[in-house]
Amino acid sequence: MIRMTAAAAATALMVGTAFAQSGIPPELFDNTRRVAGDSLIVCFDQTSLSRHFDQAIAEAIGDALFLEVKVIEGFGGFPLNGEGFVDELSLAMNNSCDMFMGISVSVNSPISEAFAVTRPYASVPFVVAVNNTEWQSLSDVPKDLRLGTAMASLGELNLINWNLQQPEDQRWRRLPYPDPNLMATRVLDGTLGGMILWQPVLAQLQREREDAKALRTVASQPLPESMVRVGALVSSRNTFLRDQVDQAIDALVADGSIAAIMDEFGYTGHAGE
């Protein structure tokens, strides 16, 4: 099952537990401090939909700081509710990782005191994809057609909240999908009028499936914009590293490096905040 790492990580961060307060046996934590001034150890969720993009960003950050980036694949395959993620993340950040990539950055999300969040390095939207050449926005999709949504995603929550504010006969029927491949198939065969999903997922589908290239994005109106701001985690004990990474991100946004990486991967949205 494919998940968006940012959503899983946000679930984990909402737990708000520090290393010492987690359910992990204390003997599993290595409390010695790593001393390696010439390298940056970067970890990833191996099931992340933006895994390769995040690594490209990490390598650009490393180059900007004159540090060798060393990759640790990390972990993945957690359920949608994020169970187990915070423990694995805590162990990794304490024992082996300098930075964990692909985190949804939100000023309103409570963060564990064990972690510090960098500036966003990219802001990437949820999009509406349809297989109809005449529709220009979601408002053109008839209400008697069903919409697919990426299960437990920000885009799905956005539609739920909008529907709740409308009369029943003005709501779209929602079908949540854990598998974006199947959801795309249902849009293509007409079972669904359209689908709401994170844009990098659509970009990946269109790279991997020739038939998915027929899908086109339309404006999300009347829904408000759903934008995921993607950043990284560092240990809250390493304020120097966070400051250096933030400065590197600012420089890479300013000189167009991150925008170029987004273009390379076919991501829409914009670099930085």
Task: Tell what function each PLM region has.
Residues 16-20:
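Sec/Tat signal peptide C-region and signal peptidase I cleavage site
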Residues 21-24, 55-64, 132-136, 142-154, ...:
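Extended ligand-binding regions for polar small-molecule ligands
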Residues 39, 120-129, 200, 207-250, ...:
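Periplasmic-binding protein-like
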Residues 46-65, 124-179, 200-201:
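Bilobed "Venus flytrap"/periplasmic-binding protein-like clamshell domains
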Residues 93, 101-112, 160-161, 189, ...:
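A ligand-binding cleft/hinge motif common to bilobed small-molecule-binding domains
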